[in-house]
Regions:
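A short, N-terminal "cap"/entry segment at the start of jelly-roll beta-barrel domains
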Residues: 1-33, 47, 114-119
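Conserved short histidine dyad/triad with adjacent acidic residue
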Residues: 21, 36-52
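A generic "binding-loop/recognition-motif" signal
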Residues: 44, 53-54, 72, 88-89, ...
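Histidine-centered metal-chelating micro-motifs
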Residues: 45-47, 66, 82, 86-92
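Short histidine-centered beta-strand/loop micro-motifs
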Residues: 46-52, 93-95, 115
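Glycine- and acidic-residue-biased ligand/ion/polar-headgroup-sensing regions
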Residues: 53-55, 60-65
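Short acidic-glycine-tyrosine-enriched beta hairpin
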Residues: 71-86
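Ligand-binding loop in jelly-roll beta-barrel domains
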Residues: 86-112
Length: 119
């Protein structure tokens, strides 16, 4: 399978970030995971949320920010990788001067139905 980046249309997901689904079972022939690029604009943050089934791996490819991960606050920079276990509340804040860009690998694949916003 091959997915040219130029053909991926971004959308806004439930947490407020701009997402490009680079590989997802609903669009491609892969089965058990998804890979997306998330962009958080300067001065913004995503909504606190959790996934009941999905484990996520985030890899920061550009920018700097702050991540809430359960009860921890992490300062993140390009090159950092974070594991988010199921049922762990999390959100991202862009604290830098350029977009915060993250590769997100989800297993099982991301679904809106598995995303619960914090109250």
């Amino acid at each position: 399978m091959h997915q040219p980046y130029s053909t991926v249309t971004p959308y806004i997901t439930k947490d407020g970030s701009e997402i490009r689904e680079l590989m997802h079972p609903s669009l491609h022939e892969n089965r058990n995971q998804s890979l997306a690029e998330a962009t958080i604009p300067v001065g913004t943050k995503t909504l606190l949320h959790k996934h009941m089934e999905t484990e996520e791996l985030y890899h920061v490819t550009r920018g700097v920010g702050r991540m809430t991960l359960g009860g921890n606050i992490l300062e993140i920079v390009a090159g950092d990788t974070i594991c988010i276990k199921p049922e762990t509340p999390h959100c991202l804040e862009n604290t830098g001067s350029e977009p915060l860009v993250i590769l997100c690998c989800c297993s099982p694949a991301y679904s809106h139905e598995d995303t619960l916003l914090a109250r």
